[in-house]
Amino acid sequence: MIFDTHAHYDDEQFDGDRDELLKSMPDLGVGTIVDVSATYESCEKVLTLAGKYPHVYAAIGVHPDEVGELNEDKIQHMKELCCNKKVVAVGEIGLDYYWDNEPHEVQQKWFIRQLELAGEVKKPVIIHSREAAADTMYIMKNYAQGLGGVIHCYSYSREMAEEYVKMGFYIGIGGVVTFKNAKKLKDVAAAIPIEKIVLETDCPYMAPEPYRGKRNQSSYIQYVAEKIAELKAMSPEEVIAVTEKNARDLYGI
């Protein structure tokens, strides 16, 4: 079944039909979802969702755009939340120089601290990196050794993807791979072994064709699987089966 390794069902875009939608997912071919926090406040929300639905798990972390609100007391509270058996990762954490909401040194400080948190609680990490390739790689090489995890919504070169794979990380691929202009990501998807790829939505964002621009949901991963299958001369069913196993290995589910 489909394993959505990165979703945001706590987002307000789902306020009108969240319960109905999440309950329907197994009937739509979706076996497992990891709901990923982006703000400190959403850490509690993703855990509540994970507690309510057997097929939903949680990741605890603060997105680089939101790290200005962090302090050590909040990190300690996040550490306590990570003890819950439904928490499978620390994330999403990283660097975002595209939006540049926080100074680079502030982003880097809290990225490193959350990598340390992952080491303390022995969880893999979900990495967000946008227009920050070199700094992300430098920090990962120095602070993420042995953690394991996924480079979410991968957007860099094939060579850098291969480097992350050598470091023990999976490459997260979502709806962008279905876009006509996504040549670089298609090259990455074709080159990286299927055993090192996991599928994701980033819903409600990043919907694949034919739903581009609409609200995304986990069942739409079928379109991502079909595109990767085409690039790799596999069947979509094989892609879904292998990436589900990869995700279970990644998150220890």
Per-segment meaning from a language model:
Residues 1-253:
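Mid-domain alpha/beta scaffold segments of enzyme catalytic cores
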